[in-house]
């Protein structure tokens, strides 16, 4: 399945919530009718079946983290094999992706921009270049900007935007050095309450 390259606001409207696909700190619903689905008849968001609600939640989380359908299924399968709560395991696996960690540290204004930085070899993990967005970041790994990429305007702009966002407690960042430490995996209470991962578990358990 190809990665979606169309308007980002349309995806957020489709899911009825801000997916944080656009840069900036202004809430997305101040820019568009987030409660209305896209299209001419968007205002008529119909009632969904139980399956439809579960599917929408899966699509929302998948799009939020910028993961393709096959990748998402693989993450779910891995989460189900791990001990503990499958839904929480799934969110932790997604949070541990390098592109997401780069975004959380504020080096990218969006997850898509963070993914580009990784793919373009602008990111170091423990001093070594890693250009795989899905790379699993472990506790105490140090993620930093490669020296020759530190002058990129978009990275500096992203760090300015990140200053206005709530800072994750599981990450420590030195903006001056453009370096951060992934201290631990986030707990469920650290993450968005707007995600209902149990719906995704129910969907894949059918």
UniProtKB/Swiss-Prot annotation:
A molecular function GO annotation: rRNA binding
GO biological process terms, semicolon-separated: ribosomal small subunit biogenesis; translation
Homology family: Belongs to the universal ribosomal protein uS4 family.
Transmembrane segments: none
Organismal lineage: Bacteria, Pseudomonadati, Pseudomonadota, Gammaproteobacteria, Vibrionales
GO cellular component: small ribosomal subunit
Alphabetized UniProt keyword annotations: Ribonucleoprotein, Ribosomal protein, RNA-binding, rRNA-binding
NCBIfam families assigned to the protein according to its UniProt record, in alphabetical order: PRK05327.1 (NF003717), rpsD_bact (TIGR01017)
Oligomeric and partner information: Part of the 30S ribosomal subunit. Contacts protein S5. The interaction surface between S4 and S5 is involved in control of translational fidelity.
Sequence ranges assigned to domain S4 RNA-binding in this UniProt record: 96-158
Natural source organism: Vibrio vulnificus (strain YJ016)
Free-text function comment from the UniProt entry: One of the primary rRNA binding proteins, it binds directly to 16S rRNA where it nucleates assembly of the body of the 30S subunit. With S5 and S12 plays an important role in translational accuracy.
Protein name: Small ribosomal subunit protein uS4
HAMAP family: Ribosomal_uS4_B
Source taxon at top rank: Bacteria
